[in-house]
Protein backbone atom coordinates (compact mmCIF):
# COMPACT_ATOMS: atom_id res chain seq x y z
CA UNK A 1 0.00 0.00 0.00
CA UNK A 2 2.69 2.50 0.97
CA UNK A 3 5.79 2.88 -1.19
CA UNK A 4 8.28 3.90 1.48
CA UNK A 5 8.83 3.10 5.15
CA UNK A 6 10.93 4.89 7.76
CA UNK A 7 11.64 4.68 11.46
CA UNK A 8 11.49 7.85 13.52
CA UNK A 9 12.96 8.12 16.99
CA UNK A 10 11.20 10.72 19.15
CA UNK A 11 13.16 12.36 21.95
CA UNK A 12 11.14 14.30 24.52
CA UNK A 13 12.90 17.29 26.11
CA UNK A 14 10.04 17.82 28.55
CA UNK A 15 7.54 15.49 30.22
CA UNK A 16 5.01 14.03 27.77
CA UNK A 17 1.59 12.59 28.60
CA UNK A 18 -0.46 10.93 25.87
CA UNK A 19 -3.86 10.43 27.43
CA UNK A 20 -6.09 7.47 26.66
CA UNK A 21 -9.26 9.56 26.81
CA UNK A 22 -10.87 7.61 29.65
CA UNK A 23 -11.61 9.40 32.91
CA UNK A 24 -10.73 7.63 36.18
CA UNK A 25 -11.32 9.74 39.27
CA UNK A 26 -8.99 12.73 39.52
CA UNK A 27 -6.85 11.59 36.56
CA UNK A 28 -8.77 12.68 33.49
CA UNK A 29 -6.60 10.82 30.96
CA UNK A 30 -4.71 7.68 31.99
CA UNK A 31 -1.56 6.95 30.01
CA UNK A 32 -2.08 5.12 26.71
CA UNK A 33 -0.89 1.53 26.94
CA UNK A 34 -0.58 -1.31 24.50
CA UNK A 35 -3.36 -3.77 25.16
CA UNK A 36 -1.18 -6.86 24.65
CA UNK A 37 1.86 -5.81 26.75
CA UNK A 38 0.62 -3.03 29.03
CA UNK A 39 3.62 -0.92 27.96
CA UNK A 40 3.13 2.84 27.50
CA UNK A 41 2.79 3.91 23.87
CA UNK A 42 1.84 6.84 21.68
CA UNK A 43 -0.97 6.05 19.25
CA UNK A 44 0.00 6.69 15.64
CA UNK A 45 -3.14 8.81 15.16
CA UNK A 46 -2.01 11.16 17.95
CA UNK A 47 1.46 11.51 16.44
CA UNK A 48 -0.06 12.16 13.01
CA UNK A 49 -2.32 14.85 14.51
CA UNK A 50 0.62 16.53 16.26
CA UNK A 51 2.71 16.54 13.07
CA UNK A 52 -0.25 17.89 11.09
CA UNK A 53 -0.74 20.65 13.70
CA UNK A 54 2.96 21.57 13.44
CA UNK A 55 2.76 21.82 9.64
CA UNK A 56 -0.31 24.03 10.00
CA UNK A 57 1.22 26.29 12.67
CA UNK A 58 4.32 26.78 10.50
CA UNK A 59 2.09 28.23 7.78
CA UNK A 60 1.87 25.18 5.54
CA UNK A 61 -0.41 25.31 2.51
CA UNK A 62 -3.82 23.84 3.45
CA UNK A 63 -4.12 21.89 0.17
CA UNK A 64 -0.71 20.27 0.67
CA UNK A 65 -1.54 19.48 4.30
CA UNK A 66 -4.83 17.84 3.27
CA UNK A 67 -3.08 15.79 0.57
CA UNK A 68 -0.42 14.66 3.04
CA UNK A 69 -2.55 13.97 6.12
CA UNK A 70 -6.08 13.70 4.72
CA UNK A 71 -8.93 16.14 5.32
CA UNK A 72 -9.91 17.28 8.81
CA UNK A 73 -12.48 15.04 10.49
CA UNK A 74 -16.00 16.16 9.68
CA UNK A 75 -14.95 17.45 6.26
CA UNK A 76 -17.14 16.78 3.22
CA UNK A 77 -14.05 15.46 1.42
CA UNK A 78 -13.37 11.84 2.23
CA UNK A 79 -9.99 10.44 1.25
CA UNK A 80 -7.02 8.99 3.06
CA UNK A 81 -3.86 10.99 3.48
CA UNK A 82 -0.58 10.07 1.79
CA UNK A 83 1.23 9.34 5.08
CA UNK A 84 0.49 6.92 7.87
CA UNK A 85 2.02 6.73 11.34
CA UNK A 86 2.38 3.57 13.40
CA UNK A 87 2.28 3.56 17.18
CA UNK A 88 5.41 4.71 19.01
CA UNK A 89 6.90 2.44 21.64
CA UNK A 90 9.35 3.23 24.42
CA UNK A 91 12.93 2.15 23.76
CA UNK A 92 14.57 3.80 26.80
CA UNK A 93 13.58 6.30 29.45
CA UNK A 94 15.58 8.56 31.76
CA UNK A 95 15.87 7.39 35.36
CA UNK A 96 17.44 9.37 38.19
CA UNK A 97 20.83 7.92 39.09
CA UNK A 98 22.26 7.65 42.60
CA UNK A 99 25.57 8.83 41.13
CA UNK A 100 24.00 12.11 40.02
CA UNK A 101 22.01 13.11 36.98
CA UNK A 102 20.02 10.67 34.91
CA UNK A 103 20.76 7.48 33.00
CA UNK A 104 18.76 5.83 30.24
CA UNK A 105 17.13 2.59 31.30
CA UNK A 106 15.75 -0.08 29.00
CA UNK A 107 15.14 -3.80 29.05
CA UNK A 108 15.95 -6.72 26.74
CA UNK A 109 12.31 -6.88 25.60
CA UNK A 110 12.30 -3.22 24.48
CA UNK A 111 15.61 -3.63 22.65
CA UNK A 112 14.44 -6.85 20.95
CA UNK A 113 11.20 -5.16 19.81
CA UNK A 114 13.18 -2.27 18.36
CA UNK A 115 15.48 -4.71 16.55
CA UNK A 116 12.47 -6.53 15.04
CA UNK A 117 10.86 -3.28 13.90
CA UNK A 118 14.06 -1.99 12.30
CA UNK A 119 14.68 -5.37 10.64
CA UNK A 120 11.14 -5.22 9.20
CA UNK A 121 12.03 -1.83 7.72
CA UNK A 122 15.31 -3.19 6.36
CA UNK A 123 17.36 -0.92 8.63
CA UNK A 124 18.90 -3.36 11.11
CA UNK A 125 22.12 -5.20 10.35
CA UNK A 126 24.38 -7.33 12.54
CA UNK A 127 22.98 -6.47 15.95
CA UNK A 128 25.15 -7.75 18.80
CA UNK A 129 23.72 -10.58 20.88
CA UNK A 130 21.89 -9.25 23.90
CA UNK A 131 23.32 -10.47 27.20
CA UNK A 132 21.06 -12.35 29.58
CA UNK A 133 19.85 -10.24 32.49
CA UNK A 134 18.70 -12.22 35.52
CA UNK A 135 15.37 -11.42 37.18
CA UNK A 136 15.89 -8.61 39.71
CA UNK A 137 19.29 -7.69 38.25
CA UNK A 138 20.59 -4.97 35.99
CA UNK A 139 23.42 -4.56 33.54
CA UNK A 140 25.31 -1.31 33.03
CA UNK A 141 26.77 -0.32 29.69
CA UNK A 142 29.04 2.67 29.29
CA UNK A 143 29.05 4.20 25.85
Language-model-derived ranges and their functions:
Residues 1-143:
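RNA-binding basic/glycine-rich loop and surface signature characteristic of RAMP-family CRISPR effectors
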Amino acid sequence: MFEQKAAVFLYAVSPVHMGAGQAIGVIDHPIQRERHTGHPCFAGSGIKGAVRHSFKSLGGDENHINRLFGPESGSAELHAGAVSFGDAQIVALPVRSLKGGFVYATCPQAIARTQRLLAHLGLARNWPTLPEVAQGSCLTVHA
